[in-house]
Amino acid sequence: MENVPTDGEAIRLSVARPEAFEPVFDRHYDSIFRYLARRVGPDVGGELASEVFTIAFAERHRFDSETDDARPWLYGIAANLARRQARTWRRGRRATQRALGGNVIWLDPAAEDRIDAQGLRQVLISAISQLRTSEREVLLLHALTDLTYREVAGALSIPIGTVRSRLSRARRQVRELLIEAGHPEVAAEFDQAGDADAG
């Protein structure tokens, strides 16, 4: 049986032998793509996922090769790219609104007629979009990936206590917004989603 190197070993070896980086890509591309697709949509998510690995490869000499798992590092790059994409979209929307005199409706007017699940999806998107960027990043990294608090902290280069406090504030605000929107049952389930992840 072939000895498969850890992420750290593969990245360390890839500094001298670039092809050694391939197992890192093979192991993590799909999960990075899924995270980005949920953040920015599948088309842009695919482009950004490729960019994550292009950046990671170019910056591989900076990776702490004593670390066995590259996921926090890769998700950190992905979060930065998703944040940059969101800023680009916001600037584009503002420019379009200015050009059209501010009379632009970005939500589908028929959304109220959609099934309850779709309506709830919009409520959740709205609630999450109202969070501060720092809290939204922590919530989405934790909710859309299998990263522990410690790994989220590593991905965002912040202390684990900051991850816990931002996640707590984000969950509290989303719960309050769900209750205001008439979904107390979902707010209760969201409250129970607060896990005991001490990692």
Regions found by a protein language model. Give the residues of each.
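Internal acidic/polar
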Residues: 4-7, 92-117, 121, 148, ...
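A short, charge-rich alpha-helical start-of-domain segment used by transcription regulators
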Residues: 12-34
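Sigma70-family region 2
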Residues: 15, 38, 51-69, 88-89
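Short helix-capping/turn signature of helix-turn-helix
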Residues: 27-30, 39, 140-148, 157
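Structural recognition of an alpha-helix C-terminal capping motif at a helix-to-coil junction
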Residues: 47-54, 68-80
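Arg/Lys-rich amphipathic alpha helix in sigma70-family domain 2
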Residues: 58-65, 76-98, 117, 169, ...
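C-terminal edge and immediately downstream basic/flexible tail or linker adjoining helix-turn-helix-like DNA-binding
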Residues: 98, 105-106, 126, 154-155, ...
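Helix-turn-helix DNA-binding module
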Residues: 125-137, 145-162, 176
